[in-house]
Amino acid sequence: TQGMREVESLAQIHQRLTASSPHGPIAPLVADVHFQSDVADAAAKVVEKVRINPGNYIDPARKFKQIDYTDEEYQTELERLRNRFVQLLDICKEHKTALRIGVNHGSLSDRIMSRYGDTPEGMVESCMEFLRVAVVEDFKDIVLSIKASNTRVMVTTVRLLVWQMAEENMAFPLHLGVTEAGEGEDGRVKSAVGIGALLADGIGDTIRVSLSEAPEKELP
Protein backbone atom coordinates (compact mmCIF):
# COMPACT_ATOMS: atom_id res chain seq x y z
CA THR A 1 0.00 0.00 0.00
CA GLN A 2 1.98 2.97 -1.29
CA GLY A 3 -0.45 5.88 -0.89
CA MET A 4 -3.97 7.12 -0.37
CA ARG A 5 -5.03 6.03 -3.85
CA GLU A 6 -4.23 2.45 -2.92
CA VAL A 7 -6.16 2.83 0.34
CA GLU A 8 -9.20 3.94 -1.67
CA SER A 9 -8.81 0.85 -3.85
CA LEU A 10 -8.57 -1.34 -0.74
CA ALA A 11 -11.80 0.17 0.54
CA GLN A 12 -13.56 -0.79 -2.69
CA ILE A 13 -12.16 -4.32 -2.58
CA HIS A 14 -13.20 -4.66 1.07
CA GLN A 15 -16.71 -3.48 0.25
CA ARG A 16 -17.06 -6.08 -2.50
CA LEU A 17 -15.73 -8.87 -0.30
CA THR A 18 -18.10 -7.91 2.49
CA ALA A 19 -21.12 -7.50 0.21
CA SER A 20 -20.80 -11.08 -1.01
CA SER A 21 -20.80 -12.55 2.51
CA PRO A 22 -23.32 -11.96 5.32
CA HIS A 23 -20.69 -12.76 7.96
CA GLY A 24 -18.04 -10.24 6.95
CA PRO A 25 -15.36 -10.30 4.25
CA ILE A 26 -14.59 -13.61 2.56
CA ALA A 27 -10.90 -13.11 3.34
CA PRO A 28 -9.14 -10.58 5.57
CA LEU A 29 -7.25 -7.77 3.86
CA VAL A 30 -3.78 -6.74 5.01
CA ALA A 31 -2.12 -3.44 4.07
CA ASP A 32 1.69 -3.45 4.00
CA VAL A 33 2.67 0.19 4.55
CA HIS A 34 6.11 1.77 4.29
CA PHE A 35 7.34 5.37 4.59
CA GLN A 36 3.96 7.05 5.23
CA SER A 37 2.42 6.81 8.68
CA ASP A 38 -0.66 8.72 7.54
CA VAL A 39 -1.32 5.99 4.98
CA ALA A 40 -1.14 3.42 7.79
CA ASP A 41 -3.74 5.44 9.71
CA ALA A 42 -6.08 5.51 6.72
CA ALA A 43 -5.58 1.83 5.90
CA ALA A 44 -6.31 0.83 9.50
CA LYS A 45 -9.84 2.16 9.04
CA VAL A 46 -10.43 -0.11 6.05
CA VAL A 47 -8.61 -3.43 6.37
CA GLU A 48 -8.33 -6.19 8.98
CA LYS A 49 -4.59 -5.82 9.56
CA VAL A 50 -1.86 -3.27 8.85
CA ARG A 51 1.85 -4.02 8.65
CA ILE A 52 4.29 -1.26 9.53
CA ASN A 53 8.08 -1.27 9.34
CA PRO A 54 9.71 0.33 12.41
CA GLY A 55 12.68 1.34 10.28
CA ASN A 56 10.67 3.75 8.15
CA TYR A 57 7.46 4.35 10.10
CA ILE A 58 8.47 7.77 11.45
CA ASP A 59 11.03 8.93 8.91
CA PRO A 60 10.49 8.47 5.15
CA ALA A 61 13.85 6.82 4.53
CA ARG A 62 17.24 6.26 6.06
CA LYS A 63 19.25 9.41 5.49
CA PHE A 64 22.72 8.31 6.64
CA LYS A 65 23.24 11.86 7.92
CA GLN A 66 23.30 11.61 11.69
CA ILE A 67 25.65 8.95 12.96
CA ASP A 68 25.83 9.88 16.65
CA TYR A 69 22.87 10.65 18.90
CA THR A 70 23.22 12.05 22.40
CA ASP A 71 21.10 10.39 25.08
CA GLU A 72 18.82 13.43 25.04
CA GLU A 73 18.41 13.33 21.26
CA TYR A 74 17.77 9.60 21.40
CA GLN A 75 15.01 10.03 23.99
CA THR A 76 13.47 12.88 22.02
CA GLU A 77 13.21 10.62 18.99
CA LEU A 78 11.70 7.84 21.10
CA GLU A 79 9.06 10.25 22.38
CA ARG A 80 8.27 11.32 18.82
CA LEU A 81 7.87 7.67 17.89
CA ARG A 82 5.58 7.04 20.85
CA ASN A 83 3.34 10.01 20.13
CA ARG A 84 2.92 9.06 16.48
CA PHE A 85 2.43 5.36 17.10
CA VAL A 86 -0.25 5.96 19.74
CA GLN A 87 -2.35 7.69 17.08
CA LEU A 88 -2.29 4.52 14.99
CA LEU A 89 -3.04 2.32 18.01
CA ASP A 90 -6.10 4.42 18.84
CA ILE A 91 -7.41 3.99 15.30
CA CYS A 92 -6.78 0.25 15.43
CA LYS A 93 -8.67 -0.01 18.71
CA GLU A 94 -11.63 1.89 17.29
CA HIS A 95 -11.81 -0.21 14.12
CA LYS A 96 -10.68 -3.53 15.66
CA THR A 97 -7.71 -3.68 13.32
CA ALA A 98 -4.71 -5.90 14.02
CA LEU A 99 -1.09 -4.84 13.52
CA ARG A 100 2.01 -6.58 12.27
CA ILE A 101 5.23 -4.99 13.39
CA GLY A 102 7.60 -6.15 10.68
CA VAL A 103 11.30 -5.41 11.09
CA ASN A 104 13.65 -5.89 8.13
CA HIS A 105 17.41 -6.25 8.49
CA GLY A 106 17.99 -3.99 5.50
CA SER A 107 15.89 -1.05 6.69
CA LEU A 108 16.88 -0.19 10.24
CA SER A 109 16.58 3.49 11.12
CA ASP A 110 19.53 5.86 11.44
CA ARG A 111 18.87 6.09 15.16
CA ILE A 112 18.98 2.34 15.72
CA MET A 113 22.03 2.02 13.48
CA SER A 114 23.82 4.75 15.43
CA ARG A 115 23.51 2.89 18.72
CA TYR A 116 23.37 -0.80 17.80
CA GLY A 117 24.79 -1.02 14.30
CA ASP A 118 23.64 -3.51 11.71
CA THR A 119 23.12 -6.25 14.31
CA PRO A 120 20.51 -8.68 15.64
CA GLU A 121 20.43 -6.57 18.81
CA GLY A 122 19.48 -3.53 16.74
CA MET A 123 16.70 -5.41 14.97
CA VAL A 124 15.30 -6.63 18.27
CA GLU A 125 15.40 -3.19 19.86
CA SER A 126 13.69 -1.71 16.81
CA CYS A 127 10.81 -4.09 17.43
CA MET A 128 10.77 -3.77 21.21
CA GLU A 129 10.44 0.02 21.08
CA PHE A 130 7.06 -0.37 19.43
CA LEU A 131 5.99 -3.26 21.64
CA ARG A 132 6.68 -1.28 24.81
CA VAL A 133 4.38 1.48 23.60
CA ALA A 134 1.68 -1.04 22.67
CA VAL A 135 1.86 -2.69 26.10
CA VAL A 136 1.51 0.66 27.89
CA GLU A 137 -1.48 1.46 25.67
CA ASP A 138 -2.98 -2.00 26.35
CA PHE A 139 -3.06 -2.94 22.67
CA LYS A 140 -2.64 -6.68 22.17
CA ASP A 141 -3.73 -7.44 18.60
CA ILE A 142 -0.17 -7.66 17.32
CA VAL A 143 1.88 -10.17 15.36
CA LEU A 144 5.63 -9.78 14.88
CA SER A 145 8.02 -10.52 12.08
CA ILE A 146 11.74 -9.90 12.08
CA LYS A 147 13.38 -10.91 8.83
CA ALA A 148 16.77 -11.02 7.16
CA SER A 149 18.07 -12.48 3.91
CA ASN A 150 20.87 -14.22 5.83
CA THR A 151 19.37 -17.27 7.53
CA ARG A 152 21.88 -17.26 10.40
CA VAL A 153 21.10 -13.63 11.17
CA MET A 154 17.36 -14.31 10.91
CA VAL A 155 17.45 -17.30 13.27
CA THR A 156 19.70 -15.56 15.79
CA THR A 157 17.54 -12.44 15.78
CA VAL A 158 14.23 -14.24 16.25
CA ARG A 159 15.64 -16.27 19.13
CA LEU A 160 16.94 -13.07 20.70
CA LEU A 161 13.55 -11.41 20.28
CA VAL A 162 11.81 -14.31 22.01
CA TRP A 163 14.30 -14.07 24.89
CA GLN A 164 13.90 -10.29 25.18
CA MET A 165 10.11 -10.53 25.21
CA ALA A 166 10.32 -13.10 28.00
CA GLU A 167 12.63 -10.78 29.95
CA GLU A 168 9.99 -8.04 29.71
CA ASN A 169 7.03 -10.34 30.38
CA MET A 170 5.68 -10.12 26.85
CA ALA A 171 4.34 -12.81 24.56
CA PHE A 172 3.24 -11.99 21.01
CA PRO A 173 2.77 -14.36 18.05
CA LEU A 174 5.57 -14.58 15.51
CA HIS A 175 5.38 -14.71 11.73
CA LEU A 176 8.48 -16.40 10.27
CA GLY A 177 10.13 -15.89 6.92
CA VAL A 178 13.43 -15.35 5.13
CA THR A 179 13.31 -12.18 3.05
CA GLU A 180 14.77 -12.14 -0.46
CA ALA A 181 15.15 -15.92 -0.40
CA GLY A 182 15.35 -16.07 -4.19
CA GLU A 183 13.85 -18.67 -6.49
CA GLY A 184 14.03 -22.31 -7.44
CA GLU A 185 15.66 -24.89 -5.22
CA ASP A 186 17.97 -22.35 -3.59
CA GLY A 187 15.08 -20.17 -2.45
CA ARG A 188 13.17 -23.12 -1.05
CA VAL A 189 16.18 -24.57 0.77
CA LYS A 190 17.12 -21.19 2.21
CA SER A 191 13.61 -20.68 3.56
CA ALA A 192 13.45 -24.23 4.90
CA VAL A 193 16.72 -23.81 6.79
CA GLY A 194 15.72 -20.53 8.45
CA ILE A 195 12.10 -21.33 9.18
CA GLY A 196 12.74 -24.98 10.04
CA ALA A 197 15.40 -24.20 12.65
CA LEU A 198 12.97 -21.96 14.53
CA LEU A 199 10.02 -24.33 14.22
CA ALA A 200 12.26 -27.05 15.67
CA ASP A 201 12.73 -24.75 18.68
CA GLY A 202 8.98 -24.43 19.06
CA ILE A 203 9.11 -20.83 17.82
CA GLY A 204 6.68 -19.44 15.27
CA ASP A 205 2.95 -19.19 14.67
CA THR A 206 2.66 -18.47 10.93
CA ILE A 207 5.15 -18.78 8.08
CA ARG A 208 5.72 -17.49 4.57
CA VAL A 209 8.12 -18.92 2.02
CA SER A 210 8.97 -15.79 0.06
CA LEU A 211 10.04 -16.55 -3.51
CA SER A 212 10.89 -14.32 -6.46
CA GLU A 213 8.53 -16.36 -8.62
CA ALA A 214 4.85 -16.22 -9.52
CA PRO A 215 2.78 -15.70 -6.33
CA GLU A 216 1.04 -19.06 -6.57
CA LYS A 217 4.43 -20.79 -6.26
CA GLU A 218 4.52 -19.72 -2.60
CA LEU A 219 1.48 -21.84 -1.79
CA PRO A 220 2.29 -25.13 -0.02
Pin down the residues of each PLM region:
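Active-site-proximal loop/turn and secondary-structure-junction residues that shape catalytic pockets
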Residues: 2-5, 33-39, 54-58, 103-109, ...
